[in-house]
Amino acid sequence: MDQNIWEYDDFIFKGDELKGMTQKGKDKVKLEGKTDLVIPELTPDGLPLKKIGDNAFYRRGLTSVVIPNTVESIGYDAFGVCKLKEVKLPEALVNIEGFAFYRNKLTKVEFGNKVKRLEPSSFAMNELAEIAFPETLEYIGASAFYKNNFETISFPKSVTKIDMYAFRKNNIHKVEVANSIDLHKFAFEPFTAVERF
């Protein structure tokens, strides 16, 4: 992956947020076929990049992305409807907004150790079969992992709520869920045997 092909004027920045791509950046992806994205760690003003904005790379056809470790928040639909196969999320990341990685081709997601909330549909319609949730995770939103390839799943003690359809359209036949978790009755498929402990 050639980091040097990406320049500041490929992106739109506002303060410490990356809002999206300029026409020059879009052309690099669409016309030149540059689909391996390396996001800069610093803004043009020298600030550490903290946020990737809503819809920043929506439908951009990206096949891979390197997200700097300074990023704390990934916005709504930021990487929605791309072609990402795997993603390593930054250590600083706390918030993953709704639809952030919706409808990609993800088979691998690596979390940092600060993520607390996975908002609705954040990873819906991917190809995930396994995942290791961080020990900081508290909330798994509605349809967060709708239509993936899970057959088994386990949750850290930190999780307090799993919302409606979070794991619908997967192939999980049996799952253990702690009594301390507020589990929506439609979180899993009707055939999933849920054991509370």
Located regions from the model:
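Consensus positions within tandem repeat domains that build extended binding/scaffold surfaces
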Residues: 54-55, 75-78, 97-100, 119-122, ...
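Structural signature of tandem-repeat unit edges
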Residues: 3-19, 28-51, 60-73, 82-95, ...
